[in-house]
Amino acid sequence: MRLTIEVIKERIVERKLFKRNRKSIEVKILAGLLYYLGLSLRKVSLFLSQFEDISHESVRIYYHKIKEVLNEPERKERNLIAIDETKLKVGDKYIYAWSAIDVETKECLGVYISKTRNYLDTILFVKSILKFCSNKPKILVDGGKWYPWALRKLGLEFERVKFGLRNCVESFFSVLKRRTKVFYNRFPNNSKFDTVISWIKSFMMFYNWMKSLT
């Protein structure tokens, strides 16, 4: 099913996603989308308040909640999956954001946030994306030493690739970094780990939605 605004609206109503329904559903969807596309919470609030009064806190809530009605990746046979990770700053500390992209469809199959970057993180992340694969796909990775043992442990074929087919996962991180640049590539000091996970999961879901429309 093509994920249109009408389908999203129907899902929001059916699942009673928002406790209060004083604002139109269309404005809530638009708020989440504009924030994903790069506007700050306050700028989204200022713009949409020309139609309905919306606080920047409401925009934040819409962005985090709407992912619940966007499409999860479909479970199907997949040939090549590119995996990578990048650093993001939360307060004065760094975390790792992992991503897996289907090389053929360019769909993001999953994101994973960790405070470390090791074999266990690799296994946990790869296991989480295999639920969207009906087969054992080939994994494309860079030179990270945390990949080989973990992927062999999972019985997966893999190949080290620096460029070419792995460009799709680099492109995902490029879009992510462009988005986090709005707050200087740094989540606020008071950001909880769960909040950061939810933010990046929302980003992934909006990313896939936009990809599906092109």
UniProtKB/Swiss-Prot annotation:
InterPro entries: DDE_dom (IPR032874), RNaseH-like_sf (IPR012337), Transpos_IS6 (IPR047930). Pfam families: DDE_Tnp_IS240. PANTHER family: ISH14-TYPE TRANSPOSASE HSIRS44, PTHR39967. To M.jannaschii MJ0017 and MJ0139.1. This is Uncharacterized protein MJ1466. It comes from Methanocaldococcus jannaschii (strain ATCC 43067 / DSM 2661 / JAL-1 / JCM 10045 / NBRC 100440) (Methanococcus jannaschii).
